[in-house]
Amino acid sequence: MAPSTTVTRRVKRKAPRAFLKRTLKQKKPHLGLGRCCDLLIHLNCLLFIQRLAEESRTNACESKSRVIKKDHVLAAGKVILKKSRG
């Protein structure tokens, strides 16, 4: 068998822990946060962005557009935020 032409890459970039901790302490100094809460917040942001990209891609395909436009992202954001509220 011939080797695959696509090479999978491992993501080596780490979460911006110092930035997240500093921002959280500036915005919400009264919160007592655990050790790994910054990693959980970073993961939550990444999952949100992934859902936003998938939903906006779906919106673009439904409108028969090859390019994801601002309107697609805004509509997807409304849907995702509504779903996350419960």
Swiss-Prot record:
InterPro entries: CENP-W, CENP-W/WIP1, Histone-fold
Compartments in which it is found: Nucleus; Chromosome, Centromere; Chromosome, Centromere, Kinetochore; Nucleus matrix
Record text on subunit structure and interactions: Heterodimer with CENPT; this dimer coassembles with CENPS-CENPX heterodimers at centromeres to form the tetrameric CENP-T-W-S-X complex, which is a subcomplex of the large constitutive centromere-associated network (CCAN, also known as the interphase centromere complex or ICEN). Interacts with NPM1.
GO biological process, one term: cell division
Entry protein name: Centromere protein W
A Pfam family reported for this protein in Swiss-Prot or TrEMBL: CENP-W
Superkingdom per UniProt: Eukaryota
PANTHER family xref list: CENTROMERE PROTEIN W
Recorded GO CC terms: chromosome, centromeric region; inner kinetochore; kinetochore; nuclear matrix; nucleolus; nucleoplasm; nucleus
Protein family membership: Belongs to the CENP-W/WIP1 family.
Function, as annotated: Component of the CENPA-NAC (nucleosome-associated) complex, a complex that plays a central role in assembly of kinetochore proteins, mitotic progression and chromosome segregation. The CENPA-NAC complex recruits the CENPA-CAD (nucleosome distal) complex and may be involved in incorporation of newly synthesized CENPA into centromeres. Part of a nucleosome-associated complex that binds specifically to histone H3-containing nucleosomes at the centromere, as opposed to nucleosomes containing CENPA.
Organism: Mus musculus (Mouse)
